[in-house]
Design a protein with these regions (language model features):
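Non-transmembrane, amphipathic alpha-helical segments
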Residues: 83, 113, 156, 175-178, ...
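Short amphipathic alpha-helical segments and their helix-coil junctions
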Residues: 64-80, 162-179, 231-241
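A mid-sequence, solvent-exposed acidic-amphipathic segment
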Residues: 165-194, 198-199
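Helix-loop junctions and short alpha-helical segments
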Residues: 86-167, 172
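Charged interaction/catalytic cores of defense and host-pathogen modules
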Residues: 1-123
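Alpha-helical oligomerization segments
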Residues: 188, 199-282
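Residue-level detector of well-ordered alpha-helical segments, enriched
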Residues: 86-94, 185-189, 212
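Generic structural signal for hydrophobic core residues of well-folded globular domains
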Residues: 98, 102, 190, 194-197, ...
């Protein structure tokens, strides 16, 4: 019989409902002395510039399905989470909401007053997301998104303009699964940014250059390649693919675009090293 040590026995599958209720209990009931994180978020919610037409944190939570109810523990009033969080998508939505509330609503100087609670919440969320291969990403305009980990995407995001970096990371957001229109817009952004360096890419990696721009120009990204009335652009093979097959090809284009950027980055790195070597010899 196999023996498992203490840390191996601690490993367990993520129960999204349990994790949600555990995090909510910290937010709703743990105090820094006088107030809870829930109190602080509710007090400052109207200052949040991204709140759209929501007037309170309670309204937002209930709209998203994360309801709470008041309970009595002896003479003490406490709050209990009553929302249903069974799926990974719902759990990710909850995590995005909480992280945006903590770091978007609570002023930085006030966050220090709730450091113990914030650290507890963030460590739980970070750990749970790690188990499902996701992480928290902050966009240039201050939004916090939960996206799937992609080493190539992260590497490219570090070397391109902030706006393009956000788009590259957002491509892996769970809400974009099945959203060809949004994926198409991101692919076009990637292609338009690569276009000025196309000739350079061709000398570095002709195969990637040829394949990437072939797909961009014939798979309904830059042009309408599904319109049979325009024979100059019509791609019958692509047009007849299923919706899912088209998305799979879009994902291939995305990965090819990342490889293009990484190929160019490697050339830049090699030039930098060569320049350093040359100066050293002199």
């Amino acid at each position: 019989m196999a023996r498992y040590n203490f840390f191996e026995r601690m490993e367990r599958e993520i129960n999204f409902q349990f994790e949600y209720e555990k995090i909510e209990n910290i937010i709703l009931n743990e105090k820094n002395g006088y107030c809870t994180l829930e109190d602080e978020i509710s007090e400052n919610f109207r200052r949040w510039r991204l709140r759209k037409n929501f007037d309170s944190f309670l309204e937002l939570k209930e709209y998203l399905g994360f309801k709470t109810e008041k309970i009595l523990k002896g003479y003490t009033v406490a709050w209990k989470a009553t929302g249903e969080v069974k799926s990974v998508d719902t759990f990710i939505l909850y995590c995005e909401m909480i992280i945006n509330m903590i770091f978007g609503v609570i002023e930085p100087d006030l966050q220090s007053h709730y450091r113990k609670c914030i650290n507890a919440v963030q460590s739980l969320i970070d750990y749970d997301l790690e188990q499902i291969n996701h992480y928290i990403y902050r966009t240039e305009d201050g939004k916090y998104l939960v996206v799937q980990k992609d080493a190539a995407a992260s590497a490219v995001a570090d070397i391109v303009a902030p706006e393009l970096a956000d788009a590259i990371i957002e491509y892996n957001h769970h809400l974009l699964k099945g959203d060809l229109k949004s994926k198409k817009l991101i692919l076009k952004q990637i292609a338009d940014a690569l276009e000025p360096r196309r000739a350079e890419l061709k000398t570095v990696n002709k195969t990637i250059e040829n394949d990437f721009f072939y797909m961009i120009n014939t798979m309904n990204v830059r042009h309408n390649n599904c319109d049979v009335s325009d024979p100059s652009k019509y791609n019958e093979k692509f047009a007849n693919l299923t919706y899912r097959e088209k998305e799979e090809w879009y994902d291939e284009i995305y990965q090819e675009g990342l490889m293009a950027y990484l190929s160019l980055e490697q050339v830049d790195r090699e030039k930098k090293i060569l320049d350093f070597k040359t100066k050293q010899k002199k």
